[in-house]
Amino acid sequence: MPKLTEIAYAKINLALHVRGKMPNGYHALETIFAFAKDGDILQAEANDTEDNLTITGPFSEGLEANKDNLVLRAVTALRQACPNKIPAGFSIILDKRLPVAAGIGGGSADAAAMLRMIGQHYQIPHELILSLANSLGADVPACVDSCLVRGEGVGEKLTQIGDRSLEEKPLLLVNPRVSCSTPMIFKNWDGVDRGALDSDGSILGAARSGRNDLEPPARKILPIIGEVVEWLQQQKGVSFSRMSGSGATCFALFDEIEDRDTAYKKLNIDHPEWWALSSLLR
């Protein structure tokens, strides 16, 4: 088998509405998932023994390459579901280019990329891939196809969006190099249902008129998130900006690539200590 390569695309929540708490203790969400063209890089090559994972890259420090890693859990789930199709082992390299605990997919995107890569190569039915993704985490199903979708429930109930107007939209992701605890952010949400996502008009209009209900508690715990959002909002040509997921990564969409590039250069001067990724929406 040749060495397989796949991108684990960075996830962005263009809007994230927390509608309440469900009987099972999870929060009911409405969100618009979008994805950058860039992310972590996965490589895998079959072997005759067992799975092994090597984690490299600028954000590899502190990550465990053990059986609890979502990438290895994804391979295990595939092998258990299709024992006659999946080899005994894979030698896997994860190039961790995105910040960890940052609100942009992280382990979920990595697991989804592994499912997508192995599933496509061994011709595993897409419905099975999505079912396995759902068993691995709330954001994993959306990350499998990594395209513009609406999510409900805990994010796993997906509705395709026909509006393709955001494809190739210039994007800037910024993280102040702090990590956010998702449970802590949800714990500090004020419990107020501020209403549903707009379902009329363009997807950009729905996103802009929406909000991220986790941004206020995240900014309260980590005020630097507010500094990032405010810096982004001040840049020329910004369509809109806010925090993604439970933070601390924030994003800005631009109307023109030139304005995004100018903002990226300016960020490296104003805040060289912050992490940034200049990309496009898929």
Curated annotation (Swiss-Prot):
<dbReference type="Pfam" id="PF00288">
    <property type="entry name" value="GHMP_kinases_N"/>
</dbReference>
<dbReference type="InterPro" id="IPR004424">
    <property type="entry name" value="IspE"/>
</dbReference>
<keyword id="KW-0067">ATP-binding</keyword>
<dbReference type="Pfam" id="PF08544">
    <property type="entry name" value="GHMP_kinases_C"/>
</dbReference>
<comment type="pathway">
    <text>Isoprenoid biosynthesis; isopentenyl diphosphate biosynthesis via DXP pathway; isopentenyl diphosphate from 1-deoxy-D-xylulose 5-phosphate: step 3/6.</text>
</comment>
<comment type="function">
    <text>Catalyzes the phosphorylation of the position 2 hydroxy group of 4-diphosphocytidyl-2C-methyl-D-erythritol.</text>
</comment>
<keyword id="KW-0418">Kinase</keyword>
<feature type="active site">
    <location>
        <position position="139"/>
    </location>
</feature>
<dbReference type="GO" id="GO:0005524">
    <property type="term" value="F:ATP binding"/>
</dbReference>
<keyword id="KW-0547">Nucleotide-binding</keyword>
<dbReference type="GO" id="GO:0019288">
    <property type="term" value="P:isopentenyl diphosphate biosynthetic process, methylerythritol 4-phosphate pathway"/>
</dbReference>
<dbReference type="InterPro" id="IPR014721">
    <property type="entry name" value="Ribsml_uS5_D2-typ_fold_subgr"/>
</dbReference>
<dbReference type="GO" id="GO:0016114">
    <property type="term" value="P:terpenoid biosynthetic process"/>
</dbReference>
<feature type="binding site">
    <location>
        <begin position="99"/>
        <end position="109"/>
    </location>
    <ligand>
        <name>ATP</name>
    </ligand>
</feature>
<feature type="active site">
    <location>
        <position position="11"/>
    </location>
</feature>
<dbReference type="InterPro" id="IPR013750">
    <property type="entry name" value="GHMP_kinase_C_dom"/>
</dbReference>
<dbReference type="InterPro" id="IPR020568">
    <property type="entry name" value="Ribosomal_Su5_D2-typ_SF"/>
</dbReference>
<keyword id="KW-0414">Isoprene biosynthesis</keyword>
<dbReference type="InterPro" id="IPR036554">
    <property type="entry name" value="GHMP_kinase_C_sf"/>
</dbReference>
<dbReference type="InterPro" id="IPR006204">
    <property type="entry name" value="GHMP_kinase_N_dom"/>
</dbReference>
<protein>
    <recommendedName>
        <fullName>4-diphosphocytidyl-2-C-methyl-D-erythritol kinase</fullName>
        <ecNumber>2.7.1.148</ecNumber>
    </recommendedName>
</protein>
<dbReference type="GO" id="GO:0050515">
    <property type="term" value="F:4-(cytidine 5'-diphospho)-2-C-methyl-D-erythritol kinase activity"/>
</dbReference>
<comment type="similarity">
    <text>Belongs to the GHMP kinase family. IspE subfamily.</text>
</comment>
<keyword id="KW-0808">Transferase</keyword>
